[in-house]
């Protein structure tokens, strides 16, 4: 079985910044098979059901063409998710906005809990710290990088990029 992941990667202008709101190319935020990019860590939900819900949310977010990519406007997705009260059933109500890879993950985590769990300030550089600050909710599962046996909601990344198993 192919592991499908969601991620946000590059704006329609081919850059990390300056993109228009919304997915202009259908490739800015997407779902696709797992790929190698030098991953060094895996963060796993301790609760399987929360992991599945985060994976579902990430997939719905990635398939919503109102969500595009631009690091300089990344918080606009977070603001839209706050507007719909982190209700996974209302993801289709999100208006045109942007995110980056880490904000997509943060929003998926918050949807898994149905509330603000993580702030919009998390980036790929500090995302692994949730295993320490929220150890009752998350754990490291770095051995999965070798086996490629990922669970729904697994966040796979390195400093600079992260993807989530959907």
Language model region names:
Residues 1, 148-149:
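Short, surface-exposed loop and linker segments with low hydrophobicity and enrichment for Pro/Ser/Thr
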Residues 1-117, 159-161:
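N-terminal capping segments
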Residues 16, 24, 122-123, 128, ...:
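Intrinsically disordered/low-complexity terminal segments and short unstructured peptides
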Residues 114-138:
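Short, basic/aromatic beta-hairpin or loop at an interaction surface
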Residues 136-148:
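Short alpha-helix capping/helix-loop boundary micro-motifs
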Residues 152-154:
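Loop/turn positions that initiate beta-strands
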Residues 162-166:
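Short, compositionally biased
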